[in-house]
Amino acid sequence: MQRGYSLVQLLVVMLLVSILATAAFTAYRESVRSANLRAAHAALLENARFMEQFYTKKGSFKLTSTKWPELPVKEAGGFCIRMSGQAKGILEGKFTLKAVALDREAEPRVLRLNESLTAVVCGKMKGKGSCTDSEEIFRGNDAECRPFTG
């Protein structure tokens, strides 16, 4: 009479458990990335509301002809948020906010929101740099963009 499980049976069970754990972890990680992107979108909307109020008071989205106003929300969901591009050269009545992941290796996507509250998510961002190098990565240069649906 045999008692217990054979080595082959235990290995099969371990294999099945590891496959299920891998699938669950992948789904969890994607869920977290999606939640972080939604948090960044909410912060972009809050900053856009600030920009609209600023425009109502000052008659321009710019602080000066070459400078943007300071945004109230600078980081959310693992993304840093800045104005895209320099104020100089941007048409009056226009702005674009941009959210770039603090860890660009883990999250290469970029989220942009313009003055019309149109949000796009871009799959790739050209250029190197980090959130502290605002000149380089907040200029534009995004690729594979599509509307953001949340």
Question: Could you tell me what each predicted segment is?
Answer:
Residues 7-10, 51, 99:
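Conserved hydrophobic beta-strand within the GNAT/NAT acetyltransferase core sheet
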Residues 31, 40-58:
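N-terminal alpha-helical signal peptides/signal-anchor transmembrane segments
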Residues 1-28:
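N-terminal single-pass transmembrane signal-anchor helix
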Residues 56-150:
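Periplasmic/extracellular, small/polar-rich flexible segments of pilin-like filament-forming proteins
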